[in-house]
Amino acid sequence: MRLRKKLMVAGQEYGLVNENVALYYNRPGRAVFQVRATDDQAEALTGMVQFALGWAHSNGMTLFFTGDIERAVRVDGQQRRLFCREISARLDSNIPLAIRHATLKDVLGAYAAATGLEFILPDKPYASVKAPAFYGHGSGFHGLACAGDIFGIADYHWQAQGDGKIFVGSWADSRWPDRPGTISEEFFIAAGSAARKIAAVPTMRPGAVLNGQRIRMVRFSGHSMTVGFEDV
C-alpha cells in the first residue's frame, strides 16, 4: 500500500522529500519538512504550512499538521528545510487579559482576536459559567492552562486539530471517548514500556485512546508513527 502525502505552503503545493512531525498533548507540535524548492522559490516559503496524508486505498486525505513556518534553511540549490510549529504556538506570546464577569467563551474570544486562531468549545455548562474575573498576565498558554481550574472543568485539556482549530474543554466532551482504538500486539513494529511504533494512521492524535491507554505524543516520519501513552 502507498501512503500519499501532500504539503502546502501558503496555498502552494511543494514536492516533499522527507518529514518529521511531532504532536503533543496540551502543547504545540513541531515539524521539519524538507521540500523541493529552488533558490528562486525561497522567498515564497513563509506563512502557513499544511500537511495531509492518507493511504492510497482510502478516500481522500486527512490534514495532520497545520502550522507556521519559523524559518527555512537552504539544503542545496533545489531543496529547503522548513522548521515549523503547530498553529497553536501563536499563543506563545504575551497576551494580557483582564475580563470581569468572564466566561470561557469570552476568554477564548479574546485569544482568537489576538491570534487569529479558531477555538472549538463544547455546548456544556462550563462554557457559559461566569468567573468574577479572568486575568492573564503572561502568554496565551498560561491563560489556557489556568482556564480549567478557573471554570471548574474536570479532566481539562486543549488540543489543536489537524485543520488548526483548537478544542478547549473536558476530555470527556472531546471526540475521543467514543472512538477508542485497538491494535493487536502483532501489528506493532516496535514496543517499549511507554511507547509503540505502528504503521501510519492519519487520524491518530494525542488525546485518542489506543488499547486502553490515552495517547500523549505522536511522532510521524516516513510510513510509521511512534505513539507515547498514559493509562486512562
Q: What is each model feature region?
A:
Residues 93-102, 169-209:
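Surface-exposed, non-catalytic interaction/assembly patches
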Residues 79-80, 84-87, 123-193:
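Short beta-strand-centered interaction patches in the first periplasmic/extracellular domains
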Residues 44, 62, 150-152, 203:
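Short solvent-exposed loop/turn micro-motifs enriched in small/polar/acidic residues
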Residues 33, 99-119, 135-160, 207:
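Amphipathic, non-transmembrane alpha-helical segments in extracytoplasmic/periplasmic proteins
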Residues 1-89, 198, 213, 217-232:
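Assembly/oligomerization scaffold segments
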Residues 75-76, 107-114, 122-129, 161-163, ...:
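Noncatalytic linker/hinge segments flanking ATPase motor cores
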Residues 89-102, 126-132:
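Short acidic, glycine/Ser/Thr-rich loop/turn "cap" segments at secondary-structure junctions
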Residues 2-28, 112-117, 163-189:
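Short beta-strand/loop turn elements enriched in aromatics
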